[in-house]
Amino acid sequence: MIYRFLLLVMLITVGFPRPLKAEVTTDGTILIITSYNPETRSISDNLSAFMDEYKLRGGKRLITIESMNCKNLSEAHLWKERMASILEKYERTAAPSLIILLGQEAWASFISQNSEIAKKTPAMCGMVSANTVVLPEDSVDLVKWSPDSKDIFKDFPDYNIVSGYVYQYNVDKNIELMRRFYPNMKKVAFISDNTYGGLSMQAFVKKEMKKYPELELMLLDGRTSSFLEVSERIRHLSNDVCVLVGTWRIDCTENYVMGNTTYMLRDANPTLPVFTIASVGLGHWALGGYTPVYHKVGKEIAGATYNFLDGETGSETGVVPVPGNYVFDVKRMHQFGLDSINLLKVLS
């Protein structure tokens, strides 16, 4: 079911601060489309930050919120139509002055549209990766699907993307990190789960690994393997393999895995060197990695929204990459005999 929320209803429903009672204008409505129900914590936190900042800056435009209510990857063939239905509704009534997409699934569904409202209306995005995949036709088997990775900075010139805050995953820096510590590495095992985010990240890693023909890429794919099957494969990985963890929430059974399953994966092969590209496994399994600095982007998007719609110059912020940094688990590194001198070499 697709939910539609007006700003006043939304603020009351999920406990946001009291709404503006005066000087709200319906001219140039802002349409926010989320991947999940707005009561989901990650969505709620970003919406709350957006509302607070937009109000603080003096924004007075009516904000309408729609949820695509996305769930498992197996229903991805439905997302394009859900997005089309939302956009058609506004195209028939009053087209918004700005569309904001929050979440990977909403963003992918939007850039998979060919309608005039999708391509011409100014758009912003948040809670998304700089690299994505365009949704397939209904007939595609999602378990076997091997999509091309697309880059928001290069591949969508026919869309009116005026701003966004995107996470950039850096395969090169993680390969360099692995080689600093394990110069004899010959294989990289990449772990991804049965989600759109996992598939999108896998497509990007496959694309980037073409730069390293001397390294064999092994895919531990939650679309085709259960937790137990992935665990068994990890158990038998050889000592010339480094693991790069992407995402791990849902396996092929479409059941959400518990947080402690990464502990069990660790215990399946305790001496296996593991790194992370997205912070998954830090604190108990991964030695470290180069990852985005995750944070709520609602405030920044509100600022970009106000500047674009209400600022004196109508300025476009452009798509902004969220910074990344190196993160390490010093305790795990000591357990593997990797000392601080090696750390300094990496960061120099």
Describe the role of every protein-language-model region:
Residues 9, 19-20:
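Cleavable N-terminal signal peptides
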Residues 5-13:
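Sec-dependent N-terminal signal peptides
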Residues 1-2:
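N-terminal secretory signal peptides that target proteins for export/translocation
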Residues 20-348:
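Short hydrophobic alpha-helices and adjacent helix-cap/hinge residues
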